[in-house]
Design a protein with these regions (language model features):
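N-terminal glycine-rich FAD/FM-binding segment characteristic of electron-transfer flavoproteins
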Residues: 1-459
Length: 459
């Protein structure tokens, strides 16, 4: 059994957290030959060599100036050439990186390879001679025919090297080594373009500090004005696209801000959706942010060779083209992006909030030792209980309750953040909430910059 594990170096110079989980899952499979594959600058070789001490026999680094500036489609193309050369039985990838945060590249890679695909894996249940069976976050039990590619959630902790562990073999491959078509590589082969980036100021509010006994009043005030809150934060400069498709009605509100002619074409197999897009030639195709939409959109992008912008929070029409805005680098910046291919395609941050759910209580790491009290408080309000990534990562809450860049997006009329520091990747998942109330003993906590009402107090 040969397993290739795709690795991306994070901004901190270490392995991306989701990729670390994918690597650990590969190392657990007895008798498997594990090969690390990455694309980047020559300096990434140091990280790969260090990681081979954990058990990988080989590490392969794709490094060439021709690969620089690649978007997800061009990255998947380069990786697919390396994977074809390695010819593994299985390919393991992390669900997404924290650099691009798109979750597109692994799915695109699987589509290009023609491999079986299982995404959002929570556990690997069985690997047979011809199939792999997994439990996934959204669909439950799934099976794929080998060769297959799986994407792994944050389900484990990567082991540490043993005292006398040995380094594996490092190979560096350039574009010529993998037989790359240079027109499909790097910036030249990327169908999306970042026009500019700027600091992410979205979601910031003017916080009014109140005493603890005013909490009930603040909730009532928030509920009164909840009907005035806009669902999508997209602005419209008056220009419109002639024809736009949505895949399901989830992104309809976003689509209507850039076109008066919007058609919901619904879910279907990737090839059938691609056929309809090619035949009807819309200006843009807008997808939701649910797991199925993210997977299908990436597959359709490969079939049609289209650019795909992920997790957009704002859309505009400019000179007859769709302009897309999305957070990047863990939400710290906003990128303004256009597609060089027609139609433009984007997934947008659709809402996971139950339509009848008026209040969400979010627990942060600051109340990790008071979860029973927080849960009772939420139950008393009839509220849904959610959590930050740090609380989930440390085992105090379930993943399906996580709000943020690597969790779900919510926008309830009332969002009460308790013990939440206000990390930008959490803000990305709740910034469209109606009224935000923050409770934190630290008066300088960033969460207060994104709250309407603040209570400086322990819970």
């Amino acid at each position: 059994m040969k397993i290739a594990v795709c690795i991306r170096q994070g901004l901190d110079g270490d392995i991306s957290p989701f990729d670390a989980c994918a690597y650990e899952e590969a190392l657990k499979i007895q008798g498997a030959e594990v090969i690390l594959v990455s694309m980047g600058a020559p300096s990434v070789s140091d990280l790969l060599l260090k990681l081979t001490r954990l058990g990988a026999a080989r590490a392969i680094l794709l490094s060439d100036k021709a690969f620089a500036g690649a978007d997800t489609l061009a990255t998947a193309y380069a990786l697919s050439l390396a994977i074809q050369k390695i010819s593994p039985d299985l390919v393991f990838c992390g669900r997404q990186t924290l650099v691009g945060d798109t979750a597109q590249t692994p799915v695109m890679l699987g589509q290009m390879l023609g491999y079986g695909l299982i995404t959002n894996v929570m556990s690997i249940d069985r690997i047979g001679a011809d199939t792999i069976e997994c439990t996934t976050r959204c669909e439950g039990a799934e099976k794929a025919t080998i060769p297959a590619l799986i994407t792994v959630e944050r389900i484990n902790t990567l082991r540490l090297p043993r005292l006398r562990s040995k380094l594996g073999v490092l190979e560096m491959w350039n574009a010529e080594d993998v037989g790359a078509d240079l027109s499909r590589c790097g910036l030249k082969g990327s169908p999306t373009r970042v026009l500019k980036t700027f600091e992410n100021q979205s979601g910031k509010r003017k916080c009014t500090f109140i005493s603890r006994d005013k909490l009930e009043w603040a909730i009532e005030e928030g509920l009164k004005r909840s009907e005035e809150q806009a669902y999508a934060e997209t602005e419209n400069n008056g220009e419109k696209l002639l024809k736009v498709f949505t895949v399901t009605d989830a992104p309809m509100d976003f689509a209507k801000t850039v076109s008066d002619n919007v058609t919901d074409i619904g879910f279907a197999e990737a090839e059938k959706i691609a056929e309809k897009i090619k035949r009807d030639d819309p200006d843009a195709v807008i997808w939701g942010s649910d797991t199925c939409s993210k997977r299908l959109s990436s597959q359709v992008a490969v079939v049609l060779g289209l650019g795909l912008c992920a997790d957009c929070t704002r859309l505009e029409c400019e000179n007859g083209e769709l302009i897309m805005y999305r957070p990047a680098l863990s939400g710290s910046i906003i990128a303004k992006i256009k597609s060089l291919t027609r139609p433009a395609m984007a997934t947008v941050r659709t809402d996971s909030t139950n339509a009848h759910q008026k209040i969400i209580v979010a627990a942060g790491f600051g109340v990790k030792d008071k979860m029973d009290d927080v849960r009772s408080f939420a139950d008393g309000l009839g509220a849904e209980l959610c959590a930050t990534r740090k609380l989930v990562d440390n085992g105090y809450a379930q993943y399906d309750s996580q709000v943020g860049l690597t969790g779900k997006t919510v926008s309830p009329p009332i969002y009460i953040a308790i013990g939440v520091s206000g990390a930008i990747h959490h803000i990305a998942g709740m910034q469209r909430s109606g009224t935000v109330i923050a409770i934190n003993p630290d008066k300088d906590a960033p969460i207060f910059e994104y709250a309407d009402y603040g209570i400086i107090d322990n819970f």
